[in-house]
Amino acid sequence: MFGPRDSRVRGWFLLDSYLPTFTLTIVYLLSIWLGNKYMKNRPALSLRGILTLYNLGITLLSAYMLVELVLSSWEGGYNLQCQNLDSAGEGDIRVAKVLWWYYFSKLVEFLDTIFFVLRKKTSQITFLHVYHHASMFNIWWCVLNWIPCGQSFFGPTLNSFIHILMYSYYGLSVFPSMHRYLWWKKYLTQAQLVQFVLTITHTLSAVVKPCGFPFGCLIFQSSYMMTLVILFLNFYIQTYRKKPMKKEMPEGAAGKEVKNGFPKAHSIAANGVTDKKVQ
């Protein structure tokens, strides 16, 4: 379906064998299960300082990837409708190097869930959250090995921009004084849905007008992105359509648990990650 691996990424960290990626994913899943058991009868941790640094780090990494992907694809003369794997020379290598950081960032983002476990936010560890985190890390191992440049650049470019907004929101939410300015969290989920639709459209444009990019990869990516559209749309409907916030009600009314001035039912699921406000 995918053909031989791309020799240009041979020897890159974590890419030569699938075993490390698979093993780290299993460790991630076991950490959720065992961590919840360990924390069951223990007090939740605050992690305020760690979360501040973590969110800042992911925001800066996302900003680097966004800028570098835009510059490298522009200088490589990338075609927005369809870009093959080997026509931009050094530009393709530059894109591949950024996409390796994108793959590695998906490993780092496993910490999103670990922080939920340590803070006993078990209601936030949903199927959407775990599915998205675990699958992205594994899928991007495949992308880097078979299609590390060309058409693959578009989704990470959009996602890096979304992550700048998302982790900036998380970083600001650590500070109670900033909560009054965080009215825009609902729009992060909307932005993600737009991102998925744009990525699917961009992917299928290479099916309509082929340029030599592997057909099987295009179909697989479109199918995977559709699962995210379905899951995120379901989350959006359940959270913002069926359970609207009633501004006239006092805090704690209608049985809603209020954390830091925000009803728990009004959290977001940006990139599969729901609200990470510090108690």
Swiss-Prot record:
Homology family: Belongs to the ELO family. ELOVL2 subfamily.
Reactions that this protein is recorded to catalyse: a very-long-chain acyl-CoA + malonyl-CoA + H(+) = a very-long-chain 3-oxoacyl-CoA + CO2 + CoA; (7Z,10Z,13Z,16Z,19Z)-docosapentaenoyl-CoA + malonyl-CoA + H(+) = (9Z,12Z,15Z,18Z,21Z)-3-oxotetracosapentaenoyl-CoA + CO2 + CoA; (5Z,8Z,11Z,14Z,17Z)-eicosapentaenoyl-CoA + malonyl-CoA + H(+) = 3-oxo-(7Z,10Z,13Z,16Z,19Z)-docosapentaenoyl-CoA + CO2 + CoA; (5Z,8Z,11Z,14Z)-eicosatetraenoyl-CoA + malonyl-CoA + H(+) = (7Z,10Z,13Z,16Z)-3-oxodocosatetraenoyl-CoA + CO2 + CoA
Motif Di-lysine motif mapped to chain: 276-279
Major localisation: endoplasmic reticulum
PROSITE patterns listed in its UniProt record: ELO (PS01188)
Domain notes: The C-terminal di-lysine motif may confer endoplasmic reticulum localization.
Pfam families found in the cross-reference section: ELO (PF01151)
Organism: Rattus norvegicus (Rat)
Molecular function in Gene Ontology: acyltransferase activity, transferring groups other than amino-acyl groups; fatty acid elongase activity
Pathway: Lipid metabolism; polyunsaturated fatty acid biosynthesis
Subcellular location as annotated: Endoplasmic reticulum membrane
Protein encoded by which gene: Elovl2
InterPro entries: ELO_CS, ELO_fam, ELOVL2
One GO CC term, this protein: endoplasmic reticulum membrane
Name assigned to this protein: Very long chain fatty acid elongase 2
Assigned keywords, A-Z: Endoplasmic reticulum, Fatty acid biosynthesis, Fatty acid metabolism, Lipid biosynthesis, Lipid metabolism, Membrane, Transferase, Transmembrane, Transmembrane helix
